A protein has these predicted regions:
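Class I SAM-dependent methyltransferase "Motif I" SAM/SAH-binding loop
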Residues: 11-14
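Conserved SAM/SAH-binding beta-strand->alpha-helix loop
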Residues: 35
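Conserved SAM-binding loop
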Residues: 42
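Conserved SAM-binding strand-loop segment of SAM-dependent methyltransferases
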Residues: 47-54
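C-terminal target-recognition/interaction regions appended to catalytic cores
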Residues: 200-305
Length: 305
């Protein structure tokens, strides 16, 4: 039997963190997302438009909830002193997570960020986050870097996840199943020519790579095919030229991923609607979380509620 629980979805993007918690029977009681195009995609798939700027929303106006979810941006805490207290985080979006945790004290939370958060600002940013959550009163705080490619998605995408519980719990992150992956599993059989990159773009991409190699630093266009185990990380700038993940084609220039393939690469279900332009779709999937990783974590969190 599914457990009944409530949750809120902050910095929701297009709802990648929400999907597995919905699947487990959770009831989402509040959502916030600033970007108007992400709001459109969210509304098309979940039937509700997220509230806008979280910095303008009073924590008292957010309903009570069991779990807080949030994939927040990585920002330095400019004044973080030795004490690394709550007020040092003012002016950053983490402060908004902290004030909501402090007011509502949900049973659990899940935060997601780039892998670099741990070393950001010589480790001060991460230390401050943990210190503030401790100050609020959370007894269990665990963090782990997990890779989408170890959870059945053919993409090398590392992210840090922070899970906390108000009470002491013996929480452990899921052990990555490391199921073998193959890029062909998410590629479409037939793709329109519009996704093939132009001669000019292909020539300039190869030239940039050659120059970068001569100077001794990495620049990637990265070329993949159906047999590739996984791609490099898809970023929000993929829409610009697609050079970070190019797919080989016989007797043609390489091509970009299609929005449908970008969706699959992040583990979103095939029924997930894309009501926005291709440019926005690439940005949204590039910013999204790998759903299969969240699915594995969500089961562990709900079990401990």
């Amino acid at each position: 039997m599914k457990k009944k629980f409530t949750f809120i979805d902050l910095f929701a993007g297009i709802g990648g963190i929400r999907i597995p918690f919905d699947e487990l029977g959770g009831n989402c009681v509040f959502t916030s997302e600033f970007d108007k195009f992400a709001q459109q995609t969210y509304e098309a798939n979940f039937g509700e438009t997220p509230s806008g700027d979280i910095t303008l929303i009073n924590e008292k106006d957010i309903p009570k909830h069991d779990i807080l979810l949030g994939g927040f941006p990585c920002q330095a805490f400019s004044n973080a002193g030795l004490r690394k207290g709550f007020n040092d985080t003012r002016g950053t979006l983490f402060f908004d997570i902290a004030r909501i945790l402090d007011y509502h004290k949900p049973k659990a939370f899940l935060l997601e960020n780039v892998k670099g958060l741990r070393g950001h600002d010589q480790g001060r940013t991460f230390k401050t986050i943990i210190s503030v959550i401790n100050e609020i009163g959370y007894q269990t705080i665990e963090s782990e870097v997990l890779n989408a490619r170890d959870f059945g998605l053919p993409q090398n995408r590392e992210r840090i996840f922070i899970v906390g519980f108000w009470k002491h719990k013996n929480f452990q992150f899921p052990i990555p199943p490391k199921t073998p992956t193959r890029l062909g599993s998410i590629l479409q059989k037939r793709v329109q020519d519009r996704y093939t990159i132009s001669d000019k773009l292909w020539a300039s991409t190869q030239l940039r790579k050659k120059r970068a190699q001569q100077k001794g630093y990495g620049f990637g266009f990265s070329l993949f095919n159906r047999e590739s185990k996984y791609t490099s990380t898809m970023s929000a700038r993929y829409y610009k030229d697609g050079s970070e993940i190019l797919i080989e084609q016989k007797d043609k220039n390489p091509r970009m991923l299609t929005p449908l393939e970008a969706r699959r690469l992040q583990g979103f279900p095939d029924g997930f609607k894309i009501p926005v332009s291709n440019t926005q779709a690439y940005k949204q999937f590039g910013n999204a979380v790998p759903v299969s990783v969240i699915r594995a974590i969500s089961k562990r969190i709900v079990k401990h509620l």
